[in-house]
Design a protein with these regions (language model features):
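Divalent metal-coordination and catalytic microenvironments
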Residues: 59, 75, 80, 105, ...
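Metal-associated gating/positioning segment near the N- to mid-region
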Residues: 106-169, 185-188, 193, 199, ...
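N-terminal secretory signal peptides that target proteins for export/translocation
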Residues: 1-7
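Histidine-rich, glycine-flanked metal-binding segment
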Residues: 38-41, 46-52, 61, 67-109
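Divalent metal-dependent hydrolysis catalytic cores, especially in the metallo-beta-lactamase
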Residues: 135-156, 173-180, 210-222, 231, ...
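Acidic, glycine-enriched loop/beta-strand segments at the rims
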Residues: 43-48, 61-74, 87-90, 394, ...
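Bacterial N-terminal signal peptides
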Residues: 12-26
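Active-site neighborhoods of metal-dependent hydrolases
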Residues: 204-217, 222, 267-409
Length: 466
């Protein structure tokens, strides 16, 4: 759980302690083109400035398309739109009163589009608490301007949070909200529905779409028949379905028409020997270490997903926390934790540091290899953080870390930004509005106080989220 006091709010939304971010809502991010007067005092507290026109010049531009970074570029913002993007040496005409930023030594990227986020956090004993006050500003301060919740335990709260953000009452990113999980009987989390029949899945999807949900997520124990009915119902109403699956293999899910699969290949049961249909075989993680990633056993699954148009969500941030030799959460993230959670997290970091035979370390590297193989074969990769696990994946901070892990996995800086921005926008069907820095698109941008092309630690120094 995250503290939400006035002091913690500043740590969350302005991050003054460690990463030096200021959340600036010029023509407010996630608040459309509202004026400052239309915003609540809670939002105005985090607005750095308001101008009709903003020019960022002489900046290193990573535009989200995967193209090489452009040095000395300029970007002009009019209202809530990007009106011009110019290469080095080009002067863009501006109006009197334009706010001008000298971007020397800084990087401009599109606002992050993250697809496995939550408004809840683990509290032990299979219980999850909602954090609708602290999480939205944390995400925005971490550069996330659009997010999809990767499952909901309190959907009415999530839907209300989205409405409050859109109305300018609280700071936060645009939200694509999943309904409650599509889970089968026997699920271990008390707040999840347990859908036993196709009819129940259809009713579930239709009810929550009527309430405003725009996506759905299937979970471990659902059967193929029930999931297939849920997918069909969601598609009939223009919604997509993702899954953290176990009882259903990735190939089976692709055949059912699923749009997305979570956690890379962490949850795949395609390679479990003698797997029973519609049954979840637990404790099989080490099977990944024996896979030959060049053999048909693996490549056939990958190719089937690609041919079926299934996106894969990388969530290496939550996997990393189990491994040894990994950095502790940054200072600001630690400060946002309750004292008892912080104590538990740091004790686990210390234990992991002393383990030389930790299988989670080898698994982390294997998951990276599998995701990179999927990407290299033409798979559509998106990214999220999954702020659950042991409680040390903190929104905002983890989103910055997610980009770094994609680069560690083998992507270039430009490719990692593309996966974290454009690909998410494409998946959500919003790439005509967001995801890349192009004239005419919404000005969802993040200015970073450093050059990420030479030092990826600079992703921690997000200065302004537009």
């Amino acid at each position: 759980m995250i503290r939400w006091t006035r002091e913690a709010a500043r740590i969350a939304a302005v991050a003054v302690l460690s990463i030096g971010m200021v959340t600036a809502l010029t023509t407010p991010t996630a608040l459309d083109a509202q004026t400052l007067d239309a915003l609540s005092p809670q939002v105005r507290e985090f607005v750095s400035f308001e101008n009709d026109q903003v020019l960022i010049r002489n900046v290193t531009l990573i535009d989200g398309t995967g193209a090489p970074a452009q040095r000395g570029a300029s970007v002009l913002i009019d209202g809530d739109r990007i009106s011009a993007v110019a290469p080095a040496g080009t002067e863009l005409p501006v109006s009197p009163g334009t706010r001008i930023f000298d971007g020397s030594g800084q990087t401009l990227i599109p606002g992050l589009v993250m697809l496995h986020e939550h408004m809840f956090y683990p509290s032990g004993q299979a219980r999850y608490n909602t954090n609708e006050q602290s999480f939205p500003p944390l995400y925005l301060a971490g550069g996330v301007t659009t997010m999809r919740t990767g499952g909901s335990v309190d959907p009415y709260s999530d839907l209300s949070t989205r409405r409050l953000i859109e109305a300018g009452r609280i700071p936060g990113p645009h939200m694509d909200v999943t309904g409650p999980y599509l889970e089968g009987p026997g699920g271990f989390i008390r707040s999840f529905p347990q859908l036993a029949t196709p009819e129940q899945a259809v009713a579930h999807v239709n009810f929550w779409m009527d309430q405003g949900a725009t996506s759905f997520k299937a979970y471990n124990l659902i059967t193929r028949e029930t999931l297939g009915a849920g997918i069909e119902a969601a598609h009939a109403r223009g919604a997509k379905v993702t899954g953290h699956l176990c009882s259903i293999t990735y190939q089976e899910a692709a055949d059912l028409g699923i749009d997305n699969l979570e956690h890379g290949f962490f949850a795949a049961t395609d390679w479990v020997q003698d797997k029973e249909p519609d049954q979840c075989p637990r404790g099989q993680d080490l099977r990944y270490l024996d896979l030959d990633l060049d053999a048909p056993e693996f490549t056939d699954v990958v190719d089937h997903l690609i041919e079926s148009g299934v996106a894969l969500t990388s969530t290496l941030t939550v996997v990393e926390r189990r491994a040894s030799g990994r950095p502790a959460p940054p200072y600001g993230a630690q400060q946002a934790m309750l004292p008892e959670l912080h104590e538990s997290v740091m004790a686990r970091v210390e234990r992991n540091a002393q383990r030389e035979d930790n299988p989670a370390t080898a698994l982390l590297h294997r998951y990276m290899e599998m995701e990179k193989a999927f990407y290299d074969r033409g798979g559509f990769l998106v990214v999220g953080t999954d702020p659950t696990g042991g409680g040390d994946v903190v929104p905002g901070y983890a989103n910055q870390r997610a980009i770094q892990l994609l680069i560690e996995m083998g992507l270039t800086v430009e490719e990692a930004v593309e996966v974290s921005t454009k690909n998410g926008a494409i998946y959500l069907g919003q790439d005509d509005e967001i995801g890349t820095i192009e004239a005419g698109k919404r000005a969802d941008l993040v200015l970073i106080n450093g050059d990420v092309t030479t030092d990826i630690e600079q992703f921690r120094r997000m200065r302004i989220a537009f």
